């Protein structure tokens, strides 16, 4: 649960991590260098927002699983300037493409990392598109130092603690805030709650969220998977049935 005690613990752990990294690389921590890096990352994140806007309107030629793979590569880029340049070109190429007309879902829960794209690929084959995803990385595409940049590391710790929507926290208000924001912004036809086997903490908020989804008349399906491929046929059947349900609800809304 998020409170002053857990926040101070997080700050202490981050401080220890910074000291360890500084010893390892042989460089001292500098608040001005941190702020310069944050400003650089904020420029990249602005492009990420533009990319997301363009990609969500170009799903006929650039499926959701490719959008997710591009976002994953942000954390793996060895040359951020080169990565940023490629993303700007991709964003420009996607602008103006035809939007996707089929049912669209919001993917929530256990993070889906490349190459474990079993569910995103099955969704695409079933004619269902991913309009957005919410997991422990969601808040990391926002500006790092939106407030009090002069405080350096403390501002960094405060930002990530306050914006952490992962299931590590019970009664996570940030998760609910992210869900409300994405539902309003992406207007999904349904919700897929993804849980990797063993990660039961991702179920902690499901009951609470289901009440909100019911209020918004959004059907929900919980999919539990692992890294094996033996369950693909079962997942395919359930996903196709869920896609038909969303399509039927769409028709009912259009005739209402």
How should each PLM-predicted stretch be described?
Residues 110-171, 175-182:
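Redox- and metal-dependent alpha/beta enzyme cores, enriched for Fe-S-associated oxidoreductases
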Residues 109-115, 197-204, 229-230:
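Gly/Ser/Thr-rich loops at beta-strand to alpha-helix junctions
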